[in-house]
Curated annotation (Swiss-Prot):
It comes from Mus musculus. Specifically recognizes and binds N6-methyladenosine (m6A)-containing RNAs, and regulates their stability. M6A is a modification present at internal sites of mRNAs and some non-coding RNAs and plays a role in mRNA stability and processing. Acts as a regulator of mRNA stability by promoting degradation of m6A-containing mRNAs via interaction with the CCR4-NOT complex or PAN3. The YTHDF paralogs (YTHDF1, YTHDF2 and YTHDF3) share m6A-containing mRNAs targets and act redundantly to mediate mRNA degradation and cellular differentiation. The gene is Ythdf3. This is YTH domain-containing family protein 3. The disordered regions have the ability to interact with each other and to 'phase separate' into liquid droplets within the cytosol following binding to mRNAs containing multiple m6A-modified residues. This leads to the partition of m6A-containing mRNAs into membraneless compartments, where mRNAs may be stored, degraded or used to transport mRNAs to dendritic arbors in neurons. Keywords: Acetylation, Cytoplasm, Phosphoprotein, RNA-binding. The modification Phosphoserine is found at residue 23. The modification N-acetylserine is found at residue 2.
Length: 585
């Protein structure tokens, strides 16, 4: 479908004009008298059916501004006749046809002299009619002295934007009736190029309204082009559309400002948060209880028993270690460097409170070593490493006398009894191995003594040792004598323990609680064996399972790794004890 584009001239002109249909060759010549009917009733009919060569359908892209021109005031022509007086901009020319406003927005780049205008702006190098016309040359030199004078004056300076009437101080078209619009100053025109606002729409409406007063354009609003009032409705104006995307921006800006722009306020809290979890700004990721740095995260939860030295564990056999914690801290102060590594490796594990010295430098892979011993956190790495390479003389002697960790252990007991022993400190475990003795609380001693006497030599009485909060069992010993309630060993970390009995250590190895947690004791509210108190008896059948796991477990660490460390600490404790005794005298 294509409609013929008619070249029109005023009635006074009798010459023939060419009719173009979007093609290069000319159609039949006709007289302008033949088109009289179209001037009154169907002036805009040709707009209804755009040629198929148009790059888009004008009906889809209706111009937002009316065309304030009249067919009676000037002729339509692309052949270089008198200029067209419509105030909207010229678009790209396609085969001699005008594309008005839509082309001004959507047209493709053209050839030289046919640059598409932007948003209705006049093309400054626009050659109407033929390529001989140029705004830089005089009209006489181009062979269009009079007819193109309006174009020369109009395009020599940028006319108003967006189809507005030419304001004061600018050259007008040949028919100057539309050149000047009252109420629009040159300052207003300049503002239209700076912003798109509601007043611009109003100004355009005024301009278009003035042009529509001409006689020949009565029916233009009925065509595909929407009426002026609906062309730029206030709710859907460009200004309103531009505001919508702008609204979310302020919301995003404050957020960005908080993180970036507001460096003065946010940075301090961020820095504080980062420093909270570190110790001595060493960057150690360990977040051990801030109150007691000595309690770094432990590898395994031996038992839900809470604090380092839980008072409820009155039965813990060696509460003697409570005073020790402060001393070891002093001794081990120079060696805290190894501790951060250990703490980091054991941090992911549950209830990381205390880490055995042997596990601090190398990292305890088996969730072992955590106890209520709060003191030797940093020292162990130094002493542990040498101990692993060089065996302490005392340890060599003990290993020569005793057959630790035997492979032929008979864990399938027919007769016998098994008890859990909880110690406050691994120092006391070291002394128990060294001196082959043990001492529990007053209540614990009575219970163990009664059990030992009840067996009457018919079966062994095994003790399963574990340090509070260590997360592992550290070994198994057999009770070898009744309790001597009046004896005082004088070797424990605390001097308050009274009584002793002999033991023989069979297994000295770290067995993580996760290896035994599945075994539950029916005589202890069905709690796991790892969640037991001092001198808690283990039923024989469950005891067999525990002994089998401990005997067959392939350990990688044991208290023997820290034997030299505990030897040194014992010497320091004895020196301090002698000093106190001298002061008392």
């Amino acid at each position: 479908m294509s409609a013929t584009s008619v070249d029109q001239r005023p009635k006074g002109q009798g010459n023939k004009v060419s009719v173009q249909n979007g093609s290069i060759h000319q159609k039949d010549a006709v007289n302008d008298d033949d088109f009289e009917p179209y001037l009154s009733s169907q002036t805009n009919q040709n707009n209804s059916y755009p040629p198929m060569s148009d790059p888009y359908m004008p009906s889809y892209y209706a111009p937002s501004i009316g065309f304030p021109y009249s067919l009676g005031e000037a002729a339509w022509s692309t052949a270089g006749d008198q200029p067209m007086p419509y105030l909207t901009t010229y678009g790209q020319m396609s085969n001699g046809e005008h594309h008005y406003i839509p082309d001004g927005v959507f047209s493709q780049p053209g050839a030289l002299g046919n640059t598409p205008p932007f948003l209705g702006q006049h093309g400054f190098n626009f050659f109407p009619g033929n390529a001989d016309f140029s705004t830089w040359g005089t009209s006489g030199s181009q062979g269009q002295s009079t007819q193109n004078s309006a174009y020369s004056s109009s395009y020599g300076y940028p006319p108003s934007s967006l189809g507005r009437a030419i304001t004061d101080g600018q050259a007008g078209f040949g028919n100057d009736t539309l050149s000047k619009v009252p109420g629009i100053s040159s300052i207003e025109q300049g503002m239209t190029g700076l912003k798109i606002g509601g007043d611009l729409t109003a100004a355009v409406t005024k301009t278009v309204g003035t042009a529509l007063s001409s006689s020949g354009m009565t029916s233009i609003a009925t065509n595909n082009v929407p009426p002026v009032s609906s062309a730029a409705p206030k709710p859907t104006s460009w200004a309103a559309i531009a505001r919508k995307p702008a609204k979310p921006q302020p919301k995003l800006k404050p957020k960005g400002n908080v993180g970036i722009g507001g460096s003065a306020v946010p940075p301090p809290p961020i820095k504080h948060n980062m420093n909270i979890g570190t110790w001595d700004e060493k960057g150690s990721v360990v977040k051990a209880p801030p109150t007691q740095p000595v309690l770094p995260p432990q590898t395994i939860i031996q038992q839900p028993q809470p604090l380092i030295q839980p008072p409820p564990l009155v039965q813990s056999q060696l509460p003697q270690q409570q005073p020790q914690p402060p001393q070891p801290q002093q001794q081990q102060g120079p060696q805290p460097q190894a501790q951060p590594h250990q703490v980091q490796s054991q941090q992911p594990q549950l209830q990381n409170r205390w880490v055995a010295p042997r596990n601090r430098g190398t990292g305890f892979n088996q969730n072992n070593g955590t106890g209520s011993e709060n003191f030797g956190l940093g020292v162990v790495p130094v002493s542990a490493s040498p101990s692993s390479v060089e065996v302490h003389p005392v340890l060599e002697k003990l290993k020569a006398i005793n057959n630790y960790n035997p492979k032929d252990f008979d864990w399938n007991l027919k007769n016998g009894r098994v008890f859990i022993i909880k110690s406050y400190s691994e120092d006391d475990i070291h002394r128990s191995i060294k001196y082959s003795i043990w001492c529990s609380t007053e209540h614990g001693n009575k219970r163990l003594d009664a059990a030992y006497r009840s067996l009457n030599g018919k079966g062994p009485l095994y003790l399963l040792f574990s340090v509070n909060g260590s997360g592992h069992f550290c070994g198994v010993a057999e009770m070898k004598s009744v309790v001597d309630y009046n004896a005082y060993a004088g070797v424990w970390s605390q001097d308050k323990w009274k009584g002793k009995f002999e033991v023989k250590w069979i297994f000295v190895k770290d067995v993580p609680n996760n290896q035994l947690r599945h075994i539950r004791l029916e005589n202890n509210d069905n709690k796991p064996v790892t969640n037991s108190r001092d001198t808690q008896e283990v039923p024989l059948e469950k005891a067999k399972q525990v002994l089998k796991i401990i005997a067959t477990f392939k350990h990688t660490t044991s208290i023997f790794d820290d034997f030299a460390h505990y030897e040194k600490r014992q010497e320091e404790e004895e020196a301090m004890r002698r000093e106190r005794n001298r002061n008392k005298q």
